[in-house]
Amino acid sequence: MPEPEYREDSDYVKSVKADAMFDSSRYEVKPINLERIPAMFSQRGLSNETVKDLAPFISLIRDKRNEKFDGYNIGFPYTNGKEETIKGYEIRGHGGYKSKAAGTDSTSSAWAADLSNGNEGLVKSVFFCESAFDAMAFYQMNKTQLGKDVALVSLGGTFSDKQIIGVMNRFPHARAYDCFDNDLAGRIYGLRMMALLEGVPMKINKKGDSLQVEAKGKPFELNTERSLLAQVSKHLSIRYKMGQWLPPKAFKDWNDCLMNKPMEVIHTPHKDERNQNLTERRKSGLKM
């Protein structure tokens, strides 16, 4: 599948490319003390109850080679579903710090919180987010509707076909859900995941605020403000292997939604207002 134009989270990507292989001996790892939950979670709107529910899938990690910082960060372990060996970590720290452990496998591994108590064959829904904090926020906001037959997944600011395939092979009876960000990159991630799960080769390119798509010899344009599933189904026969559970439109991602931090609205003047502004600028120019 051709690589479309989209951004990956540079902080995550830079850290992953620093080392070729993940070396677990480089990191000191310990579980979260539920009697002393790090304040970083509450600063992101995440409740103690949410942290306790997901604590089996979260660690505190310290990089022994980091001479500038000797403390612990929050680590979300990456696995590939084929073996129990940890393949790296998505890392979050104070001051907005985000990275990945050196050598983290972001090609075929991801953070996966399986809430089925290990009964992977019983998982019915897998919710894909761009970060672990987003996945935790999604869980907190929708917990009463989710049940225990679900899994939360973070791709950590990147998107790889092998990540998606590996996760869905791990949960063979589940339906994938696009919970990605409300931006162009998030829409492309969702579209790529749909194409992958439907088995439809797809070319995707940006065209202003829309997406130009070609699949099965058919070119068509998608409005990123509307449901991708509904639009694609008008042009292609799809099996609805993927669902969408996006953040509300006013918010960039699920964590911003939890924290009630809406995106800035760009004010577009009406025609009369634009004409008035133009007249005032011209008058100002004449005075000069």
Give, region by region, the residue ranges found by the protein language model:
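Basic, glycine-enriched DNA-binding surface that flanks or lies within the catalytic cores of DNA
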Residues: E8-D105
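Generic alpha-helical structural element
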Residues: R26-I32, F127, N182, G243
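Residues at alpha-helix termini
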Residues: Q43-S47, Q140, G199
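Phosphate-handling DNA/RNA-contact segment within nucleic-acid enzymes
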Residues: R65-R170
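TOPRIM fold recognition
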Residues: T144-M288
